[in-house]
């Protein structure tokens, strides 16, 4: 995860829940990356923010059940080999292919206030860096949210091209989807995000969570308390369904 702020429940259902499950199965040798170098691609003017949040992200991992005795947590900038691989992989990917990546296209559109009409090479090329992160440790299974699938596919393309030139050196990774889908924000937006201001953070206090849930979007057609509401457009009902057992919902 990128240390640009505290992690939220979208991160939990998107990948952390699956990571904890795989860790506790005893069948895998898990590695978790704190991607501080990647975080600088759109926070280049605020390195202190990235440095500070490395610790915050690590604490969020621990609070969710990531066990350092079973899982290796590492910081991207402390593994120089990934930077080396990124340079090699950059020769295998065209600018046009990076621009077609759906995840990258969406994120660039969301960051117009940072980049304007001209995105930096560093940000456009972060899928190449991500491929290096995965293959440095011969990653076979990568827990991701649904919106991250195009990044894994691009990594697989890089691996195939590299192997076609240099022989079967790299492992082609597989995405492991969490059981949950992309988590909606408090405002009803299809994605919860730090930059969107619609997130419930894993480290929020009980009072903060209560305040946020009380302000969440509900059915606008439910005017009176005893009116029947539509749970499909009520974020309170949506979160209740996420966290409660079936018989409680």
Task: Cite the ranges covered by each PLM segment.
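Short, histidine-centered active-site or binding-site loop motifs used for metal coordination
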Residues: 1-3, 36-38, 140-141, 196
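Active-site cores that bind ATP or allylic diphosphates and position pyrophosphate for catalysis
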Residues: 105-249
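N-terminal Rossmann-like or analogous alpha/beta NTP/dinucleotide-binding catalytic cores
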Residues: 3-131
């Amino acid at each position: 995860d990128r240390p640009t702020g505290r992690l939220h429940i979208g991160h939990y259902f998107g990948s952390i829940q699956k990571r904890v499950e795989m860790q506790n199965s005893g069948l895998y040798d898990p590695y978790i990356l704190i991607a501080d170098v990647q975080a600088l691609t759109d926070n280049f003017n605020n390195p202190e923010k990235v440095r500070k949040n490395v610790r915050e992200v690590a604490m969020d991992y621990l609070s969710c059940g990531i066990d350092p005795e079973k899982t290796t947590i590492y910081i991207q900038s402390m593994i120089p080999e990934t930077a080396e691989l990124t340079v090699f992989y950059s020769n295998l990917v065209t600018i046009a292919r990076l621009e077609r990546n759906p995840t990258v296209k969406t994120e660039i559109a969301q960051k117009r206030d940072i980049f304007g009409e001209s995105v930096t090479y560093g940000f456009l090329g972060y899928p190449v860096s991500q491929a290096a992160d995965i293959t440095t440790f011969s990653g076979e299974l990568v827990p991701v949210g649904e919106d991250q699938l195009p990044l894994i596919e691009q990594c697989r393309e890089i691996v195939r091209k590299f192997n076609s030139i240099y022989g079967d050196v790299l492992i082609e990774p597989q995405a492991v989807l969490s059981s949950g889908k992309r988590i909606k924000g408090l405002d009803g937006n299809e994605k919860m995000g730090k930059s969107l201001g619609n997130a419930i953070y894993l480290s929020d206090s009980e009072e903060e969570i209560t305040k946020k849930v009380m302000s969440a979007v509900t059915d606008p057609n439910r005017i009176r308390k005893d009116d029947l509401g539509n749970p499909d457009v009520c974020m309170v009902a949506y979160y209740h369904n996420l966290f409660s057992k079936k018989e409680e919902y």
